[in-house]
Every structure is written in structure tokens, then in C-alpha cells.
Amino acid sequence: MAVDPYKSGQFKKNPYFAKSDLVGRLVVTLTTTYETRGLQMIAQPSRCICEKQIHELILTDEEGVACGSTVNRIAYVGFVEITEGGVITNGDAVYYNDQLLGHIAGFDETHMPNHYNIVLYAPERKTGEDLGLVPGGRIVIRQVKA
């Protein structure tokens, strides 16, 4: 049986040398926060996301979120429809138009196969409404080189 290289700790450094941006458009703006949401980050730091899929963006101000951790303090940002698919990874920057929303902290599969919860970290926890996001805005997820 094959072993998951992330779960078994086989990767000693980030294997993603270079990758294309993932592009989408915001289709829903959300406006709710929770203090005890209990999102469970999966063990893997990456997801392959296909064109035409719709996924949810959620923001947390909890520091130290990692694969396998639980996230409680969240703000709902919105749903994005993917127009150019790709591979997204923890640490990638997420932009609305040219505004940095945060960096990917992990992925929760609560609602799969319907959609992923893509959890972003930012120092301030704000909803999509708080951030002034409007459906139709461009979402770009871009690799951050160390």
C-alpha cells in the first residue's frame, strides 16, 4: 500500500519549485464570524483545484495554523468560482483584485465533495463584507517564493 508522503514526513522541504497562479472570480460575499468553528485542517498542504469548481474562502487570525490542526476563530469571506485551475499550497498569497486577503493556512473538507474550505491567515479577522468584496471581483492565488 502506498504511503502518503505528507503524513509520513517524507518531504523535508517544500517540493513546489514553481507553479502557475490559480485564478477565479468571487461569486458570493459572506458576512459571518465564529469563535468556536472547529475546522479540521487536513494533513496535506496542497490541493489540485479544477476550472469551474466553486470553493469557500475563510479567514482566521489564529497564529500557528498547520496541517492537522483545528481552527476556531474564523470569518467567512466568500465563494470563488475557478476560471484557471491549478495547484494551491499553504503559504500561497490570496488576492481580491490587487488587495491581499491573506495566505493559505490549510484546507478543511467538512463540505466535500461539494467544496473545500480554503482557510487563510491574516492578522485581522474580517468577513467578505468587512473587506468590501463584491461578486465579480478577481481572485488570484499566487505562490510566495521564500
Language model segments and positions:
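N-terminal intrinsically disordered, low-complexity, charge/repeat-rich segments that act as generic
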Residues: 1-56, 61, 65
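Glycine- and charge-enriched low-complexity intrinsically disordered segments
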Residues: 6-7, 11, 30, 116-146
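Short, basic/aromatic beta-hairpin or loop at an interaction surface
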Residues: 60-77, 115
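Short alpha-helix capping/helix-loop boundary micro-motifs
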Residues: 77-84
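Short, well-ordered loop/turn sites that connect or cap secondary structure elements
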Residues: 87-89, 94
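Hydrophobic beta-strand signal
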Residues: 94-95, 140
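Conserved "cap/hinge" positions at secondary-structure junctions
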Residues: 97-98, 143
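Short beta-strand-centered aromatic/proline hotspots
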Residues: 100-110
